[in-house]
From Swiss-Prot:
<protein>
    <recommendedName>
        <fullName>Fructose-1,6-bisphosphatase class 1</fullName>
        <ecNumber>3.1.3.11</ecNumber>
    </recommendedName>
</protein>
<keyword id="KW-0378">Hydrolase</keyword>
<dbReference type="GO" id="GO:0005829">
    <property type="term" value="C:cytosol"/>
</dbReference>
<comment type="subunit">
    <text>Homotetramer.</text>
</comment>
<feature type="binding site">
    <location>
        <position position="114"/>
    </location>
    <ligand>
        <name>Mg(2+) 1</name>
    </ligand>
</feature>
<keyword id="KW-0479">Metal-binding</keyword>
<dbReference type="InterPro" id="IPR000146">
    <property type="entry name" value="FBPase_class-1"/>
</dbReference>
<dbReference type="Pfam" id="PF00316">
    <property type="entry name" value="FBPase"/>
</dbReference>
<feature type="binding site">
    <location>
        <position position="112"/>
    </location>
    <ligand>
        <name>Mg(2+) 1</name>
    </ligand>
</feature>
<feature type="binding site">
    <location>
        <position position="115"/>
    </location>
    <ligand>
        <name>Mg(2+) 2</name>
    </ligand>
</feature>
<comment type="pathway">
    <text>Carbohydrate biosynthesis; gluconeogenesis.</text>
</comment>
<keyword id="KW-0119">Carbohydrate metabolism</keyword>
<feature type="binding site">
    <location>
        <position position="273"/>
    </location>
    <ligand>
        <name>substrate</name>
    </ligand>
</feature>
<feature type="binding site">
    <location>
        <begin position="115"/>
        <end position="118"/>
    </location>
    <ligand>
        <name>substrate</name>
    </ligand>
</feature>
<dbReference type="GO" id="GO:0030388">
    <property type="term" value="P:fructose 1,6-bisphosphate metabolic process"/>
</dbReference>
<feature type="binding site">
    <location>
        <position position="90"/>
    </location>
    <ligand>
        <name>Mg(2+) 1</name>
    </ligand>
</feature>
<dbReference type="GO" id="GO:0000287">
    <property type="term" value="F:magnesium ion binding"/>
</dbReference>
Amino acid sequence: MSRPSLTRFLIEEQHAGRIDAELRQLITIVSRACKRISIAVSKGALGGVLGDAGTGNVQGEAQKKLDVLSNDILLEANAWGGHLAACASEEMDHSQPVPDQYPSGDFLLLFDPLDGSSNIDVNVSVGTIFSVLRAPKGTEKPGDEHFLQPGTQQVAAGYCIYGPSTMLVLTLGHGTHAFTLEREEGSFLLTQANMRVPEDTAEYAINMSNQRHWEPAMQAYVGDLLAGKDGARGKDFNMRWIASMVADVHRILTRGGIFIYPWDKKDPSKPGKLRLMYEANPMSMLVEQAGGAATTGRERILDIQPTQLHQRVPVFLGSKNEVAEATRYHLDADKA
């Protein structure tokens, strides 16, 4: 029996009344853009796309050539279809409405065009993360303020991981599903429906080099993980860290674990590393739809009311019971 394609999956979701034609078109166009990015990434040095672009983004980070190329691909692909009102990117200072010469649609698209791009030159898996919101009714030219909706308002979220195979992981609010790119025919085919994150885990992903900058609750939590079966947790834990959020979260969606990027005082102007709108919200929706959980260590990420387009937050996401345990350490410390 042949595997359903992404196109068929989306049409069936539309027939079931779970999405409308505009959202189906939007996801289809994003998936096509991801195919183009996948081709560019796979060429590596042969495509002349490695290295720095010589520019910086609004985050103050040096842009890679592939950051800029991926951003341009997503902008161009989504400009003219009539399904989008505006888009916002980690690589742009402000949101960008659809050009005047094209029809405007009902949706807002946010994306990190190439998450983990610092790993490109060493051939580690990277990916595109995206989030879809509805434009507020009556909004003719959406601005930054119209994107400031809590993650619970997302109508779709996903990522495309460019690794040994290219995979699109998607939620439309009814489970999380994985599609693998069949390169010969150029189609994303459903390879894992209704992904489930195990409730318990003995695996965590964190950058331990920042340990000295963590708050006491975080120090205590990781200290107990490191103590293993001889400590308070009574079991051994393994640590994994790829330094590419897409790759780390994909592993957790596949076999469980907890991904942690906590609050730290390394840079007081950036106490949280990850962006709420482009990374934390879409990944939290995907993980929750797969039975996992996602918090800042103190509150559910999807409940946060954003105040800035490029807002940063701490992130704890993955296996539900372990996220709850990590959150408990922080809440108990706050009460002490």
